[in-house]
Amino acid sequence: MAQTTNPQESLWGVDSSPAIKSYTLSNLRKIPQIEKFSEEQIFEMEVVAQVLPFKANNYVIEQLIDWDNVPGDSMFNLTFPQKHMLKSEHYDMMASVLKNNPAPKEIKDMADKIRLELNPHPAGQMELNVPILKDGTKLYGMQHKYKETTLFFPSQGQTCHAYCSFCFRWPQFVGMDEMKFAM
């Protein structure tokens, strides 16, 4: 456990637990543990989170991350945006925009420009990996890359309780409909 070593001290349990609270870019600075970070470290997270989706919840933050071991904690690295997740030129482009007190549209335009260069669907998977029935009907919202695996992307399931920082499904979460695999 991250915050407590004695499970009996935890507020989280089978019979009772606090309400789930989500954290995204919009309230990243309200995460109590973030106060320990320098302004530069927080800015780095915000730069990356403008391009790649960030979402965590209070259970992950309170129970799964060992804040005494950050940045070495695996759950922290899996959940929180890291500067190296973007190419240096992409990071610099977004950081430059953010430093100039931009309008929301400027931020979105730069984020979308960078996202389009990230190749979220390599090898033609938007066309080539869509399953096809015997009658030729394409099953959009599904992906069949490997013989034993089919991925299903229902429209109503396009979210997670927390976004993993290296998830290949990030196009499902950033509001660029042409990049979604959803049904």
Regions found by a protein language model. Name each.
Residues 2-144:
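Flexible, acidic/Gly-rich N-terminal and inter-domain linker regions that tether
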Residues 144-182:
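Canonical Radical SAM [4Fe-4S] cluster-binding loop centered on the CxxxCxxC motif
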